[in-house]
């Protein structure tokens, strides 16, 4: 009997944890979508974007239940920030950056973002509740492009250092072709490493001019 009494609370706790996990996932969807004002349901986009824009769009599709649940849904959306971030601006920014990253990875243009955020196709919309978020997205894109450019520059420097190392080590053109998986002679413009091989040749020419100047 004592064993049964011990197992019962444990089962209740595990069941509660499962329920909380499901509820937490639901709350995350609501929280992210709540940061962008509702837009018309006629805007076509993928499911993930719709979740980010409006959780209620998937929850209240029944017109009969819309009136009954509108007030409850409104209260839930209002309480989400309190439950997760307590209205913390930094928390909201973090959620928005997740959305921005998703849209950036998906190749969303400024025009595409205007559509998602229900902004006019052109011009400023300073009084629109999503205008500030749109501007922040443009800043996010600029930041990401700079990061990509910096990373590309660092990668190029590393490649040049590697190529100079091969030259100093006495590797021949045949050796390097083998490293790149290229044929021993001739052009291979369709090979994915052909451009790298051409870069290697340019680096060797530049370096040899400096060494034997």
Curated annotation (Swiss-Prot):
Extent of the signal sequence: 1-19
Its biological purpose: Effector that enhances P.infestans colonization of Nicotiana benthamiana leaves.
Species classification: Eukaryota, Sar, Stramenopiles, Oomycota, Peronosporales
Taxonomic superkingdom: Eukaryota
Underlying gene: PexRD1
Keywords: Host nucleus, Secreted, Signal, Virulence
Name of the featured protein: RxLR effector protein PexRD1
Induction: Expression is induced during host plant infection.
Motif (RxLR-dEER): 50-77
Swiss-Prot/TrEMBL domain comment: The RxLR-dEER motif acts to carry the protein into the host cell cytoplasm through binding to cell surface phosphatidylinositol-3-phosphate.
Location within or outside the cell: Secreted; Host nucleus
Secreted among keywords: yes
UniProt main location, coarse: secreted
GO CC list: extracellular region; host cell nucleus
Species this protein is from: Phytophthora infestans (strain T30-4) (Potato late blight agent)
Family: Belongs to the RxLR effector family.
């Amino acid at each position: 009997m004592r064993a049964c009494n011990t197992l019962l609370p444990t089962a209740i706790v595990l069941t509660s944890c499962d329920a909380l996990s499901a509820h937490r996932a639901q709350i995350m969807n609501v929280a992210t979508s709540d940061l962008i004002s509702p837009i018309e349901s006629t805007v076509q986009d993928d499911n993930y974007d719709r979740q980010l824009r409006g959780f209620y769009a998937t929850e209240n599709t029944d017109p009969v239940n819309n009136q009954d649940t509108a007030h409850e849904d409104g209260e839930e959306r209002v309480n989400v920030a309190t439950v997760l971030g307590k209205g913390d601006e930094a928390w909201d920014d973090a959620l928005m950056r997740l959305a921005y990253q998703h849209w950036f990875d998906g190749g969303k243009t400024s025009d595409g973002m205007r559509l998602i955020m229900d902004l006019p196709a052109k011009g400023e919309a300073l009084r629109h509740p999503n205008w500030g978020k749109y501007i922040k997205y443009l800043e996010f894109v600029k930041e990401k492009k700079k990061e990509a450019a910096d990373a590309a520059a660092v990668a190029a420097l590393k490649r040049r250092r590697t190529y100079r190392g091969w030259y100093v080590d006495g590797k021949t053109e045949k050796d390097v072709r083998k490293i790149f998986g290229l044929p021993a002679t001739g052009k291979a413009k369709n090979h994915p490493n052909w451009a790298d091989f051409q870069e290697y040749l340019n680096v060797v020419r530049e370096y040899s001019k400096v060494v034997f100047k």
